[in-house]
Amino acid sequence: MASSEQAEQPSQPSSTPGSENVLPREPLIATAVKFLQNSRVRQSPLATRRAFLKKKGLTDEEIDMAFQQSGTAADEPSSLGPATQVVPVQPPHLISQPYSPAGSRWRDYGALAIIMAGIAFGFHQLYKKYLLPLILGGREDRKQLERMEAGLSELSGSVAQTVTQLQTTLASVQELLIQQQQKIQELAHELAAAKATTSTNWILESQNINELKSEINSLKGLLLNRRQFPPSPSAPKIPSWQIPVKSPSPSSPAAVNHHSSSDISPVSNESTSSSPGKEGHSPEGSTVTYHLLGPQEEGEGVVDVKGQVRMEVQGEEEKREDKEDEEDEEDDDVSHVDEEDCLGVQREDRRGGDGQINEQVEKLRRPEGASNESERD
């Protein structure tokens, strides 16, 4: 069945127009070449082969071309020996290949393209794995070297900058150290000067203290000497209110006036002679008072009231001086005593003594009624 179908297929082109008979039909020739190259067909004689090809619609030219291409034109069937009868050999069925249309060509091209693509892919993989590393290895090394050189240049620049900064900082630190040393030297000079000034001041202060001590001692000596030798006693005086008033007589008006003036004069004389220094310098007032007294009243004037008061005041002053001496002995630090304080103490002592004397004298001068009124007030 297959051989009949194959025989029918090449018979179809015979019904084509005459243009196809003129041109050789390559597919038919190719099938004829394959048919002639078959080992069984080659054993058959040429006449039978030609006759079979003509039956299939091949022309003589095409048959000749098929014989030339197949190379079986000189083939002759081998002698089978003497035979009485020739057995007709049936020609084998020609296996005619079907007519390949244009789609089969595209398939062949596609398969070829796929094969070429596979080969190209293989070459590409080989190129990537083996050839590229060999080619690009040197380039990468060069790039790495360039990178290393760039990094080294950057590092050298940064190191140079840091070195310059360190040099500037060291210079500034050295300047600061020099300034600090200068300040330390100035402070040392100032301390030495301060020590010298303090020593000189201390010496001056000690000298001043010694001078003050000597002055204080001299003042104490003067005070003690003044108090050891009491002032010269003055004549005793009697207040005016104790003097008996005599009746005035017309024969002696001057005496009355003088006696009335004598009542006032003792007060003035006493006020002028309030201080002990002044008492010694006012003897005239005392003589006046005693000159006015009569011979009967001289015995009463012997009573020295003022001397008693003065003795009492001197006793109190001596007690105070003893207390002050004890306090001075207890106080070791006499360096801070000022001359003004000493003078103030002296003035207070003087005022206290004189004031007490004056108060007692005034009490003696005043009458009892006046003293009571003053106490009530």
Swiss-Prot record:
Residue ranges, compositional bias (Low complexity): 1-15, 244-259, 265-275
N-acetylalanine modified-residue sites: 2
Keywords: Acetylation, Membrane, Peroxisome, Peroxisome biogenesis disorder, Phosphoprotein, Protein transport, Translocation, Transmembrane, Transmembrane helix, Transport, Zellweger syndrome
This protein's record includes keyword Acetylation: yes
Region feature Disordered, mapped onto this chain: 1-24, 230-377
Topology within the bilayer: Single-pass membrane protein
GO CC term, one of those recorded: membrane
GO biological process terms held by the UniProt record: cellular response to reactive oxygen species; microtubule anchoring; negative regulation of DNA-binding transcription factor activity; negative regulation of DNA-templated transcription; negative regulation of protein binding; peroxisome organization; peroxisome transport along microtubule; protein import into peroxisome matrix
Composition skew (Acidic residues), residue ranges: 323-342
Membrane-spanning intervals of the chain: 109-126
Xref: Gene3D superfamilies: Winged helix-like DNA-binding domain superfamily/Winged helix DNA-binding domain (1.10.10.10)
Sites bearing Phosphoserine, chain numbering: 232, 282, 335
Physiological role: Component of the PEX13-PEX14 docking complex, a translocon channel that specifically mediates the import of peroxisomal cargo proteins bound to PEX5 receptor. The PEX13-PEX14 docking complex forms a large import pore which can be opened to a diameter of about 9 nm. Mechanistically, PEX5 receptor along with cargo proteins associates with the PEX14 subunit of the PEX13-PEX14 docking complex in the cytosol, leading to the insertion of the receptor into the organelle membrane with the concomitant translocation of the cargo into the peroxisome matrix.
Subunit record text: Interacts with PEX13; forming the PEX13-PEX14 docking complex. Interacts with PEX5 (via WxxxF/Y motifs). Interacts with PEX19. Interacts with tubulin.
Entry's disease: Peroxisome biogenesis disorder complementation group K: A peroxisomal disorder arising from a failure of protein import into the peroxisomal membrane or matrix. The peroxisome biogenesis disorders (PBD group) are genetically heterogeneous with at least 14 distinct genetic groups as concluded from complementation studies. Include disorders are: Zellweger syndrome (ZWS), neonatal adrenoleukodystrophy (NALD), infantile Refsum disease (IRD), and classical rhizomelic chondrodysplasia punctata (RCDP). Peroxisome biogenesis disorder 13A: A fatal peroxisome biogenesis disorder belonging to the Zellweger disease spectrum and clinically characterized by severe neurologic dysfunction with profound psychomotor retardation, severe hypotonia and neonatal seizures, craniofacial abnormalities, liver dysfunction, and biochemically by the absence of peroxisomes. Additional features include cardiovascular and skeletal defects, renal cysts, ocular abnormalities, and hearing impairment.
Protein family per UniProt: Belongs to the peroxin-14 family.
The name this protein goes by in its record: Peroxisomal membrane protein PEX14
